[in-house]
Amino acid sequence: MEREGLSGFELLVVVIVGIGLALVGAVWAGASLALAVAGDEPRLPFSAAADAAIRLPANLSTPAEAWAEPYAEALPGVFLYWCSTALAATAILGVSAFVIRWVNRSKVGTAKRRPLGVDGRTKYAKRRDLAPLLVSGPTSGRFVIARFGRHLVATESPPPRTQGRVGWLARRSRRSDRGAVALFGPSRSGKTTAAVAGVLEWDGPAVLSSVKADLLATTQGWRSTLGEVRVYDPTSSTTPKRASAMWSPLQQAGTVVGAQRAARALCDAAPRGGVEGGMDFWLAQAEILLSGLLFVAHNAHRDMDAVCEWVLTQDRPGELGPGEVRAALDSLNLSNSAAVGRGAVEVAKGLVSVWEMEERTRSSIYATAQTVIWPWTDPGVAASARAPKAKKGRRRSFVGLDLPWLLSGSNTVYLCSPIEDQRRLAPAFGGLLNDLINQAYRHVAATGKPLDPPLLVVIDEAGNTPLRSLPEYASTLAGLGVLLVTIWQSLAQLEVAYGKAADTILTNHLTKVFYAGLSDSASIQYVDRVLGEAEVDTRSHSAAERTNGGSDQFSTTRLPLAPAHVLRQMRPGDALLVHGTLPPAHVRTRPFYRSPHLANRAATDLTQEGTRA
C-alpha cells in the first residue's frame, strides 16, 4: 500500500499541536471533574481552559485564580482541584498512548490469527511467558540453567496432583513437568561452566559423568559437604592409584535375571563404530553369551578376570576337555542352593546354544563379546572390579556403587576418564551408568513412587558416552524422579552418535539450550525450523517528484527469528533457550566463577568424609 509521507516540519507541527491539546484538555477535564465532585454543575468552556492553562504555572498554590470570572469563584479548593486534575491527566495520557499505538500499528502483513490456540506470529519470550521456569533463587529439585534478567531459569517441577475441577488460570497456564535438559555448544562456549553452576546449587543425590577434570575439580569439595562422594576412575586420571570406587558387573549377576540385566547394561554401552542394524544382532547374541558367563563367574566366586579369559579363549567343551565354564556349570548344578542349581540349568541352555552354532557364527559372537568385556583387560579397571575374598573363598560384598547407597543422602558418584580412554572403556563407564539407571527403574516399579528427592544425572560430552538406551532414558527418566542433563558439542554430534534415533532423543529433551558460536548446519537448520520466521515491516521511499515530497511504500517480509549469523555471533555467555511449548528465549549463562557464593563453593576443600570410596 502507499500513503503520502509527512515532512519533518509537518510532523513537528502535529506533535506540538497534539501536546497543546492534551494539556488544555487535562486542565479543562480536571476543573470540570473538581466541580462535579464538589456538587456544582460543570459548565466550563474549552476556550476558558485554554486561557487558564497559560496562567496556571504562575498560580500553582491558588489554581482558581488562573481562571477568569465567573469560573474562578465556582472552583473548589486547591487539594480537590489538583487531585481531580491529576486523575484527568492520567486518563488523557492513557487514551493518548492507546491512540498513538493504534495509529502506528502495522497496517500491512497477515491478519492476527491463533491456529491451535497459539499466536501465529513467532516472537521471543517475555518474562511472563517464562513464568513456569523463573525462580528467585536455588530451589530444591530444580536444576538452574541460566539467567533471564534478574531471575534464574530452572527446570520445572512436577505439577501438584490435585483432584477436582481445574481452575481457569490452571487451564491457561503453560506449566509442563520435569524433563530432560540438553546443552549444545562448541568447546569453550560455557556449557560445562553452566552445568557446574547448576551442580553447585543442587542439593539432592547426583551422578556426574565427565571426560574432563573441570566438573570434578570444581564441585567435588562442595558435594562432599552435603554427603558422601565416590569417584569411579579406574585409570587413576583424577584420583590416586587404587583410590577409585569399586564396581563390577558381577554385583547383580547372582541370579539369572540379574545376570541378564548386567549383560544388557554392558552391551547397551558397547561402541558400534557407525554400524547400524546388523550390529544389533551380534550384540544380542553376545548378550546371551555374557549373561551365562556372568552368572557362572558370580556363583563360582570368580571375578571379571575369569570372564575375560573365557571370552578371549572361547572357553567351551571340545576335544581337549569340557572346559572351565562347563565344569563350573556342572559344579553349580550340584549346589546346595536350589536357586543356584535352577539358574545353572537355565544359563546352560543359552551357553550351549552358542557353543553348538556353526564355527563362523560362534566366532563372530565371541568377537563381539570381546569388544564388550575388553575394558576389564585393563589392569586398573580389573582391579576396581575385583572384590577381595573373605574366609573359605566366599566373596565379600563391594563397598559399592548402587542406588540404595546413592539415595541414602545427598551422595555423589563421579564417573571420570580421560578423553583418550573414553571410547576404549565405554562398556565399563556406560555399564555402570546403565546399572544405576536400571536400578532406578526397578525401585520405582517396586514402590510405585518417583524418587524423592530427585536424582540428578549429568552426562558431559554425551557424544563420547554411547548409551543405546538414551532414547528411552530421555523420554522416561523424568517420570521416575530422575533429571537427565546431557551436554553436546553440536546437534551434528548427536546425529553422528545416534543416527535415526537422534530426533527421538532431541524431542524428548524438554529443555534445549544453544550456546554462542554454533555453526554446524544441523543446529542451524533445527533452530530455523523450530523458531520459524518473523514478519518484519519494510519501508521504501519514492522521491520522483521533488515538489510532492515523495511517497512511502510499506510492506512486510519474512525473516528467520534466529538467522544463522545471529546464532553464531551471539555474545559469549548468551544462549538460546527452547523449552517445551514456551516461546524461545534469549538467556545468559551463569559462570560460577563470577558469582561470589558459587565461587566460594567451587573452592571448598574435599572433606575427609567425602573421600571414602
Question: What do these predicted ranges mean?
Answer:
Residues P205-S209, V229-D233, L483-Q489, K512-A516, ...:
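Short hydrophobic alpha-helical runs that function as membrane-insertion/retention elements
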Residues S96, V108-G141, T255-C267, T313, ...:
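Short alpha-helical interface patches
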Residues G25-A26, G30, A34-L35, A182-V482, ...:
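P-loop NTPase motor domains
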Residues P418, A462, Q489-L491, G517-L518:
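Histidine- and/or cysteine-centered catalytic micro-motif in compact active-site loops
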Residues A89-T90, F281-A284, S410, E472-S475, ...:
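P-loop NTPase motor core of the ASCE superfamily
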Residues L477-V496:
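Sensor-1/coupling segment of RecA-like P-loop NTPase cores
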Residues S173, K449-P450, T504:
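Structural motif
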Residues M1-G20, W28-S189, T193-A197, G532-E533, ...:
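Basic- and hydrophobic-enriched, low-structure N-terminal and domain-boundary segments
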